[in-house]
Swiss-Prot record:
Keywords: Aminoacyl-tRNA synthetase, ATP-binding, Cytoplasm, Ligase, Nucleotide-binding, Protein biosynthesis. GO terms for biological process: aspartyl-tRNA aminoacylation. One of its GO terms (molecular function) is ATP binding. L-aspartate binds at E171, R217, H448, R489. Its EC number is 6.1.1.12. NCBIfam families: aspS_bact, PRK00476.1. The keyword Zinc-finger does not apply. Belongs to the class-II aminoacyl-tRNA synthetase family. Type 1 subfamily. This is Aspartate--tRNA ligase. ATP binds at R217, D218, E219, Q226, E482, G534, L535, D536, R537. Residues 195-198 are annotated as: Aspartate.
Amino acid sequence: MRTDYCGQLNLTHEGQKVTLCGWVNRRRDLGGLIFIDMRDREGIVQVFFDPDQQAAFSQAAELRNEFCIQITGTVRARPDSQINKDMATGEIEVFAESLNIINRSEPLPLDSNQTNSEEQRLKYRYIDLRRPEMANRLKTRAKITSFVRRFMDNQGFLDIETPMLTKATPEGARDYLVPSRVHKGKFYALPQSPQLFKQLLMMSGFDRYYQIVKCFRDEDLRADRQPEFTQIDVETSFMTAEQVREMMEKMIRELWFEIDGVDLGHFPVMTFAEVMRRFGSDKPDLRNPLELVDVADLVKDVEFSVFAEPANDSKGRVAVIRVPGGAELSRKQIDEYGKFVGIYGAKGLAWIKVNARAAGLEGVQSPIAKFLNAEVIEGLLSRTDAQDGDILFFGAGSVKVVTDALGALRLKLGRDLNLTKLDSWRPLWVIDFPMFEDDGEGGLTAMHHPFTSPCNMSAAELAQDPVSAIANAYDMVINGYEVGGGSVRIHRNEMQQAVFRILGINEQEQQEKFGFLLDALKFGTPPHAGLAFGLDRLVMLLTGTDNIRDVIAFPKTTAAACLMTEAPSYANPASLEELSISVVAKKESE
């Protein structure tokens, strides 16, 4: 039906007859002449209708926005005075000779001036996706997946599909369950990840596996989360953690250069302990220059109990953030930051303004200065490298509260004061995570997942001291987003059972949930490691949006609903009866 795409025409096509298919983006009547901007997935071109072409001209008078049309005409150069440098096709136009109105459009339910709510855009997603901004994001997504497949194929990886209907296993979030009609009362689970299947593929000898795969998690949603999302899933045999990181870093560096034209350089590697201490986050945004600085040793003997008590407590922390130029903040602004850290459990936000660094105690302004002597002030100013015009913000309390509160404050200050370099890329690897963390009920839970191997520990040593275990795990972080994470896996039966026991999974439950895995580990399992990238997050970063729904063709809302199809919906009674399911309505009090 067509010879060319609208957005691909240029001066090299001058004089050629072309047939185009697409939509009316805009129509203009100018002094008896009709111009339209015609749009397809590749872009927009101007089409000119001359009254001398009577049939086409009379039809063009009927055109309205979003009519689906086909035109045949000749490409010609625009006069110099009419060249539009803001359009990729701005040097040419198409002189229309025939017009076919394929389909008419009713007035759009979306406003072309972009004043639509997100709910409207999701309800009429098929119209919203016609916008070049949205279409370009999905085209970039396609380029990214195409690049990943080429890279992985060239590295000798095999693209192998794993099941969508599988067994529920504890991976940190709720499962989406699918009832079985054949096996009454039993349910499949949609996979939260292909984790166990890709490990089984390594046990099967496939050595290098990858898959671009849908995953499902029934969890509370945020701007960067969806109930169904896409992973670039990778697993290898006989490779160390360092080798996996090296290969995956190479892929991401080449991807960024391909899509954005940027060389990310080599990624720094930091431990979990270091990033939590310096940045208050396990996914730090390194574009932000602010850091947390520990000062407990400097204030442990002061007569200010807010500092002295946590400074002398092994579970306490006193830390400070130096904000360049922050002395200009008003008391009202400082009070607002105090309320902000309260969200994270902080009981207040002490501060010191540095007016004259060389004057020491006499050169600072602070409600707490009266509790601190000249030696302490000098120590604080020296350790933080404070300069005239800076402000110091303090956190004091438990390690968790101080780390969380100052970590969040660091990000907020970076945005509010334009300290974060938004036009740059700052990737890193985070390694050496704790293997377990407190579950809040006196037990332990796996920080990553229960199939992660510890670093340099036997099963007996792990069982004896699980709290000190370091996981052989690694996360890739770019600009404050965790874009990928992985680990070296457990490949010995006794180690896997030891981990299960630490997590409170008894022998019977181990067999019920993971019997197939424990059996497989008995038959010559190779050492293996892997990683998974969040494709949606990668696309989000590379297209410059902060909302993951912008890079998914048909996303769900934060309530996990599809406004377009009205999913989820009620099942008809006959289907429920066939599945032996009865729906029990919740009482209002519940």
